[in-house]
């Protein structure tokens, strides 16, 4: 049930391969603070390669001999990648730890230190990405499009991973709204998030289709850069236009829940039309305690760099048409959202997933 997602800059000319090898996708988590050195929580900074965040959390719980609920992290990170992130373990007392004997497959401990507060979900500034794309075609078009993205941003769509394989989490959300019980709290949360994301993506897609993605209008709700603070736009003047151009404010779309839409005039009409087409979601979400919130529709990439790799630099192949790009994204935003606007990419981990599924299936059949 995934919707078609309109491109802001038209369909990309270039194509290429993503994650031909795990080291082609690197993520570096950035927290807004560093551990202070004392407190009940031990913060462990790790580099993981080809390892799932939940798997690492479970292994840390075993190592520290605590319940899994006492291990926290700011956000989930890709499995098929090299990622650096923090974990927090609740270990009251003054015991000093030496983690030299911590042995988790694919995990390297970078540092660890105590802190006086729990590491909570979402408590990160954002992530820096360093990606290598291989077999890139139409290099000139690729570099020109990258420059457009740097200057103008991309639609802040929720990535496909938000919706599960084939958009299955959206279907499960519909089952939830029709009365099916889901006891697992995390799964229920995933389905509700998928439903909200579906509405948001639908509104965003409609704004692009109606050519008002980058046009502020009376009745819009704008969000201040670097914050979640929003305000209703009563008047459009040259000052607000300039603030939008300077990326000081952004247009928003609804994260659906109980309460009235914050928009008015034409923006509210557009949002209400999308809601009418998705009544099951819009009537179901408030029943689970979710309230109306807003999310910016423009994703701005920052701290960007692009490098065309020579054959000497790209050890994976003799003749290189590989490109390395790096950029920073705020928390809750997806690198794949940037990539889909940049090129038609094939994620090579899809093949890995299929091979692993086949192997696991064969093992179960023979058990």
Swiss-Prot record:
UniProt keyword list: Isomerase, tRNA processing
A GO MF label: RNA binding
Known EC number: 5.4.99.27
Catalytic activity: uridine(13) in tRNA = pseudouridine(13) in tRNA
Keyword tRNA processing carried by entry: yes
Domain TRUD, chain residue ranges per copy: 153-300
CDD domains found in the cross-reference section: PseudoU_synth_EcTruD
A GO CC annotation given for this chain: cytosol
Domain of life: Bacteria
UniProt-recorded name of the protein: tRNA pseudouridine synthase D
Biological source species: Colwellia psychrerythraea (strain 34H / ATCC BAA-681)
Gene name of the encoded protein: truD
């Amino acid at each position: 049930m995934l919707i078609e997602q309109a491109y802001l800059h038209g369909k990309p000319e270039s194509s290429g391969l993503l994650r031909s090898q795990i080291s082609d996708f690197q993520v570096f988590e950035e927290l807004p603070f560093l551990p202070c050195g004392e407190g009940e929580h031990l913060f462990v900074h790790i580099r993981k390669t080809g390892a799932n965040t939940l798997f690492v959390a479970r292994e840390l719980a075993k190592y520290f001999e605590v319940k899994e609920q006492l291990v926290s992290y700011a956000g989930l990170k890709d499995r098929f990648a090299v990622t650096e992130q923090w974990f927090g373990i609740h270990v009251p007392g003054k015991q000093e730890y030496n983690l030299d004997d911590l042995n988790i497959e694919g995990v390297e401990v970078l540092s660890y230190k105590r802190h006086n507060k729990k590491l909570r979900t979402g408590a990160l500034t954002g992530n820096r990405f360093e990606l290598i794309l291989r077999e890139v075609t139409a290099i000139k078009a690729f570099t020109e499009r990258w420059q457009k993205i740097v200057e103008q941003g991309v639609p802040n769509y929720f990535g496909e991973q938000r919706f599960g394989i084939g958009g299955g989490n959206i279907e499960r959300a519909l089952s939830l709204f029709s009365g099916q019980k889901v006891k697992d709290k995390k799964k229920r949360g995933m389905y509700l998030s998928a439903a909200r994301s579906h509405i948001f993506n639908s509104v965003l897609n409609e704004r692009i289709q109606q050519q008002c993605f980058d046009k502020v209008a009376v009745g819009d709700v704008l969000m201040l850069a670097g914050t979640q603070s929003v305000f209703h736009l009563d008047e459009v003047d040259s000052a607000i236009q300039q603030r939008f151009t300077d990326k000081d404010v952004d247009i928003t779309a609804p994260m659906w829940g109980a309460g009235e839409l914050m928009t008015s005039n034409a923006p509210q009409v557009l949002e209400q039309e999308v809601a009418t087409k998705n009544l099951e979601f819009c009537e179901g979400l408030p029943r689970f305690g979710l309230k109306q919130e807003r999310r910016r529709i423009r994703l701005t990439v920052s701290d960007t760099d692009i490098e065309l790799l020579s054959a000497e630099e790209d050890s994976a192949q003799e003749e290189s048409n590989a490109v390395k790009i790096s950029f920073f994204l705020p928390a809750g935003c997806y690198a794949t959202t940037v990539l889909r606007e940049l090129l038609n990419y094939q994620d090579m981990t899809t093949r890995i997933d299929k091979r692993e599924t086949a192997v696991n299936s064969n093992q179960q059949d023979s058990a």
